[in-house]
UniProtKB/Swiss-Prot annotation:
The keyword Repeat applies. One of its GO terms (molecular function) is RNA binding. GO terms for biological process: defense response to fungus; response to abscisic acid; response to glucose; response to salt stress; RNA modification. Residues 485-561 are annotated as: Type E motif. This is Putative pentatricopeptide repeat-containing protein At1g56570. PPR repeats lie at residues 44-74, 75-109, 110-144, 145-176, 177-211, 212-246, 247-281, 282-311, 312-346, 347-377, 379-413, 414-444, 450-480. The lineage of its organism: Eukaryota, Viridiplantae, Streptophyta, Embryophyta, Tracheophyta.
């Protein structure tokens, strides 16, 4: 049995004794230039190098290093085996150290050494290391090696903030292969420049370069990144023309394109036409359904399982999010049980989805429990999800305490975290705390508050009745207030019966920005009614009738016996409507007996005014 076969067999043991013996006796080999007969074993360094490669293939990184250290003579092939092994095993820092040690000891790298160490520089995203290797490439005159040039281009495309350096290398390559083109297209796409990626793809086609399935998937991804379903359809047509429609990764990328661009009906049609489907296919469609039709996502999961597929963490994450969207607590709890039985409960992304689901379903204790179970794995999303859960249910003090605890644990908040804690302060009326966090955003963390943050603070002040301060903040905003800003002011004026100049100004601003927003007209009419200005009240209502404005009925969902039902305000067409309204009548009676008195000060009969 050869060394390589022995290494790959189940009987494989670290550093066999005969290899050690060969290494020890290496120094006493005859220096005569006699030719080895075909039956004589390979030289010691070749045996050791082959074994190093096998060690890395088996994942025995330390054994590979130990054997390498025992080699008395290390040629470029042995060094390259170590560097390539480290890079392939994701020990990128060790690959760089090994390369540095190799150069220091005077061994000149070859093109395979350089491409492997460039791969490690790319994986570490350390541009300075990659630039040093580039200098070695120039010094050794290996710039013409396509293997090295492709690796250098890949490194610059990944580590740089622009594609300038990668494009310079690309232009100097005289004979380009499919890897060259695909690397550049991928670089543009990953940097968020889908247009640049598609331009390179078009140039590739014009030069009649070989188009691989992987290159097509990147081009489709570039189309999706700029929401260009038209370009995606053109690529789809070329897929059929080139005979790649049986290539599942290509077909999955096209399905993802339709989903990301919001073409759900086309995505579903395409999905049903696909002859072959894998886990990625199903996950792609379920993920899109979670965003657009959560109840259908849950039904699709039933079909998924009926066809023998087994869910992974990504599947469960989409399903838990679907339950959160429609507040399907029972379904979410069932999924949680399955997640636990599958051993996925340690996955932090899934845990974050569960925290969010329980919070949106109003079950804060279970959100806290899941949050507590990942105490050693929490990331920024974990803290943010729990803060949002606290804030949306009025636990402002708990959200503030959690924010302070997060900061003290060494996690630096971002803009979304500040939005979460400010929103919690807004719902709980913690004005001073909210203003404190608003002020430290820029001074301590260097985060410039965006429009949403300003609107949140305006609403915080407005809800607390500090309408004058809220208006002053609007005046100081570094950008023009939008309809949400003025809407927050208007809502505060109505809630606190502040029916003066500010309320009318806010209403006028919202109507200018969103002239067809019916809620503004309704609110302004309420303000006029509260002030006793019935002429103005009638004028606003007449405007609404002339514009044909009618307030859109709100929609909601409810889960009954594992089936999701949707319903609207005053819905008489729902199943068992008579029973539903009978129960509603009983609930109204109970609320009255409990002492609830509805606010009727500004109530106007909508039927009379035609809205």
């Amino acid at each position: 049995m050869s060394i390589t076969k022995l290494a790959r067999s189940n009987a494989f043991k670290p550093i066999p004794n005969f290899v050690r013996s060969s290494l020890r006796n290496a120094g006493v080999e005859s220096s005569q230039n006699t030719e080895y007969p075909p039956y004589k074993p390979k030289k010691h360094h070749i045996l050791a190098t082959n074994l190093i490669v096998s060690y890395f293939e088996k994942g025995l990184v330390e054994e590979a290093r130990s054997l390498f250290d025992e080699m008395p003579d290390r040629d470029v092939v042995a060094w390259t085996a170590m560097i390539t092994g480290y890079a392939s095993s994701n020990y990128n820092a060790r690959a760089w150290e090994c390369f540095h040690e190799m150069v220091k000891q005077g061994t000149s790298p070859n093109e395979f050494t350089l491409s492997s160490v460039l791969k490690s520089c790319r994986n570490m995203k350390v541009l300075a290391y990659g630039a040093l290797v580039h200098g070695v490439v120039v010094k050794l005159g290996m710039e013409g090696s396509l293997y090295v040039d492709n690796a250098m281009m890949n490194m610059y495309a990944t580590c740089s903030v622009t594609m300038e350096a990668a494009c310079l290398i690309f232009r100097d390559i005289k004979v380009k292969n499919d890897v060259t083109w695909t690397t550049l297209i991928t670089g543009f796409t990953h940097l968020g420049d889908g247009i640049g990626g598609l331009k390179m793809y078009k140039q590739m086609l014009l030069e009649n370069a070989e188009v691989t399935p992987y290159c097509i998937t990147i081009a489709v991804r570039a189309s999706a990144s700029i929401d260009s379903v038209t370009t995606g359809k053109q690529i789809h047509a070329s897929v059929i023309k080139r005979g790649f429609q049986s290539n599942l990764p290509v077909m999955n990328s096209i399905l993802d394109l339709y989903c990301r661009c919001g073409y759900l009906s086309e995505a579903k049609h395409y999905f049903h036409e696909m002859e072959d489907k894998d886990l990625i296919t199903w996950n792609t469609l379920i993920s899109e359904l979670e965003r657009s039709d959560s109840s259908e996502a849950l039904l699709m999961f039933q079909r998924f399982e009926s066809q023998g597929f087994v869910p992974n963490c990504y599947t469960f994450t989409s399903l838990v999010a679907a339950c959160a969207n429609i507040a399907a607590l029972n379904c979410g709890q069932q999924l949680h049980g399955r997640i636990f039985r599958r051993g996925f409960n340690k996955n932090v992304e899934l845990a974050n989805a569960l925290i969010d689901m329980y919070a949106k379903c109003g079950n804060i204790p279970d959100s806290q429990r899941v949050f507590g179970e990942i105490v050693d794995r929490r990331n920024l999303v974990s803290w943010t999800s729990m803060m949002i859960g606290y804030g949306s249910h009025g636990y402002g003090a708990e959200a503030v305490e959690l924010f302070d605890k997060m900061v003290s644990s060494g996690i630096r908040p971002d803009r979304i975290v500040f939005m979460a804690v400010l929103s919690a302060c807004r719902h709980a009326g913690l004005v001073e705390k909210g203003l404190k966090y608003f002020n430290v955003m820029e001074s301590e963390y260097g985060i410039n508050p965006d429009r949403d943050i300003y609107n949140c603070v305006v609403d915080l002040l407005g809800r607390a009745g500090k309408i004058g301060e809220a208006y002053e903040l609007v005046e100081r905003m570094p950008f023009k207030p939008d309809e949400s800003t003025w809407g927050a002011i208007l809502g505060a004026c109505k809630a606190h019966k502040h029916n003066g100049l500010i309320s009318r100004l806010a209403a006028r601003k919202v109507m200018e920005l969103k002239p067809k927003m019916v809620g503004t007209y309704v609110m302004l009419s309420y303000i006029y009614a509260a002030e006793g200005k019935w002429v103005d009240f009638a004028r606003v209502r007449k405007m609404m009738r002339m514009m044909g404005n009618k307030k859109e009925a709100g929609m909601s969902w409810i889960l009954v016996e594992n089936q999701v039902f949707s319903f609207a305000v005053s819905d008489k067409m729902c199943p068992n409507a008579s029973s539903v309204y009978s129960v509603l009548g009983l609930l109204i009676e109970e609320t009255r007996e409990a002492g609830y008195v509805p606010e009727l000060d500004s109530l106007v009969n909508d039927q009379e005014v035609g809205t």
